[in-house]
């Protein structure tokens, strides 16, 4: 019929020979509805993966030039010049973690928790300042909490645990908002 679907599933681990794309209670899948013929596609969301598999439904396909477009904090210019290979590996992993978890705001984990959580931000903001000498992402992060007049499902004057995308299910940890005060003091 000239139309079909491509399913791109992905995850950070394999379970046997399979990719369990709902393992993290998320849907780690991109669905493309396409007509027969050549086309290009770009998906712009903060995915993380190590393994990827493509399935087709109602169409034959050939995939060319599949690649990841890197999105994250700019490359960090600070380096650790150490003869200790383990220490160097830890440092490099820390830089990589910072870059993946810092884009427009601080994220707990871009594959699972894409909102900015207070508490995490307190520590990540220190890393941003140490690595870049700036607090630009922290400014954006804190501003998200300051701009709204109120927050749905919270008492007046109280801040959410994470924003955007706080929990509206009655689960609330009040001391999480206190991290805002501690972070704002250092800012």
Over which residues does each language-model region extend?
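Conserved active-site neighborhood of enzyme catalytic/cofactor-binding cores
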Residues: 143, 156-187
